[in-house]
Amino acid sequence: MANKPVKKVVLAYSGGLDTSIILKWLQTEYGAEVVTFTADLGQGEEIEPARAKALAAGVKPENIFIEDVREEFVRDYVFPMFRANTVYEGQYLLGTSIARPLIAKKQIEIARKVGADAVSHGATGKGNDQVRFELGYYALEPDIHVIAPWREWDFKSREALLDFAEKHQIQIAKDKRGEAPFSVDANLLHSSSEGKVLEDPAVEAPEFVHMRTIAPEDAPDKPHIFTLDFERGDAVAIDGVAMSPATILTKLNELGHDNGVGRLDLVENRFVGMKSRGVYETPGGTILLAAHRGIESITLDRGSMHLKDELMPKYASLVYNGFWFSPEREMLQAAIDYSQAKVAGQVRVKLYKGNVSIIGRTSPYSLYDQDLVTFEEGKVAYDHRDAGGFIKLNALRLRVLAKRDKR
């Protein structure tokens, strides 16, 4: 139940059943004026219907905010994360995690604009998203009041939730009276499916779960080869055609979809302490990660590459756990961005039945010296005898240890 007076609240609103119920609950339980924010993150569905639904629920026209944030999402969140080659627990490309800070930021901006004293979200009390949203809110507006309905209301079952919806004339799709087969989240970077039929980690996910990719075995028998250009660590062109960040990711998603690239079935460790199984599709991101590592392989020196690889798991955990606006993430970002100054050039990519292969790399800043590495007689002076002293110095501690152990 409501325990603090709230005059105006900004709700992250999708227009779906759950956030429509939350909207009405905020009005009835808090007596608050509700402001809705709906973001177009490239989730692949129309967002304008959210306006009509909010109006039907009694939200004033001036309190309905709908914004296309796809370019900002990719430019300021996805690309910075990919400069770090960010992967959580060796597999997850953080498609859901990276979207939450942007939504939280927009809610706080709107709250300041309209004079709202609270913000609200539709994340459940078991998942990571509640943490991500709220850490974002507090980092940007430390005294904001946060309403998390799933942790507050008294509904004991889904039936009770649907009864509330019917009582308040909230439209319910016919299939909502039964259990939905799984829960879906989507944006321009990925789609995720969790829960219900996917909760048993021993059971293979049904094919219909996959929305962003065709099955690899159904992909074309001929590989697709293209080029991806980079500047300062960010992709800027496909096949020589310059594109905006969101357009590039959209095109990579299309290429990945058509070639069965980017499917992932994993069990991850949630920040809140439990394990969860998810089926993820990140076609464009999977291609982008492989290509970025490809261009880094010829433009970064060994020390920089290895340090980045050491820092990456920490960076990934910060993003996954909701600390995007933390000083430590910004410190890591500064180091990563510094490393990308000369990460520029072109990568040739081959897609074939779910696989991404890097088959060529060129850069004006390449550190690869063909004359130095050739097995033929090189033009660069390299005395093979020098390696003997190098090996002996590196072996010194091993020899000392071996002598001690033989005593």
From Swiss-Prot:
It comes from Caulobacter sp. (strain K31). One of its GO terms (molecular function) is ATP binding. InterPro entries: Arginosuc_syn_C, Arginosuc_syn_N, Arginosuc_synth, Arginosuc_synth_CS, Arginosuc_synth_type_1_subfam, AS_cat/multimer_dom_body, Rossmann-like_a/b/a_fold. Homotetramer. Keywords: Amino-acid biosynthesis, Arginine biosynthesis, ATP-binding, Cytoplasm, Ligase, Nucleotide-binding. This is Argininosuccinate synthase. L-citrulline binds at Y92, S97, N128, R132, S183, S192, E268, Y280. Its main location: cytoplasm. Belongs to the argininosuccinate synthase family. Type 1 subfamily. It comes from the Bacteria. Its EC number is 6.3.4.5.
